[in-house]
Amino acid sequence: DTILWKTERFVNGIDFLRKALKLDNVHIMGHSCGSTFLIEYMITKQPKGVKSVIFSSPHISSPDWMADAKILLSQLPMSIQDTISKYEALKNYTAPEYLVATDSFYARHLSRKHWPIHPNVECENVPGFNDQIYEYMWGPTEFNITGTLKDFDRSVDLDKITEPILFMAGEFDEARPETMYKYQKLSRNASVEIIENAGHKTMIDQPEKVYEAVSRFFNKVENNK
């Protein structure tokens, strides 16, 4: 039901979860599109009890995301660029050649490990990825936003967040490190951690380094009470 596929529903879900689990005081991390809902939560709800926020490989602004994607696409071999341009002009996102070309992008910037990534078999009873929601709200690929989030942009509202912020991204992330430093300058109290040799899926590429970065941030927040 596409009526339910709205930003507000996912934002409200954060409140529902906090109330159900009685999470009065929290540090909240949103990864990728999770950061979209997290920043919307912080701006529209102005929630109490949030000690800090982590925007991990964040989608804060669709214009910024597409600008980053354009830069990263321009670094691909010209043959791959031409293939992507050809099929996007035709709006044919299922052609085998196009899928191979997009996988080349993903292998560089989505995950630095073997692509495609196989699901974690240890996560039992976890439903598969919902392509319908992804395509409706986002689009056909990571670098082509055609869905309801196409015009999303909260970067101008970052200075409204008074809680400590950590912007974290992979060295080769779709959310480019340069953009993280841009967001830091737009924020009141923010720091940046760049995870070496990681793509967008930082917690898969470099889980130990992510843990260390988050721990440093938490210690900094707790020590500055």
Residues of each region from the PLM?
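Active-site loop/oxyanion-hole signature of alpha/beta-hydrolase fold enzymes
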Residues: 1-33, 212
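Alpha/beta-hydrolase
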Residues: 74-75, 81-163
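Conserved hydrolase catalytic core segment
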Residues: 24-68
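Flexible "cap/lid" loop of the alpha/beta hydrolase fold
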Residues: 51-93
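Catalytic active-site module of serine/aspartate enzymes centered on a nucleophile-bearing elbow/loop
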Residues: 189-225
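Active-site acidic short loop of glycosyltransferases
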Residues: 19-25, 47, 162-163, 189
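A conserved amphipathic alpha-helix that caps or lines the catalytic cleft of carbohydrate-
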Residues: 18, 41-42, 184
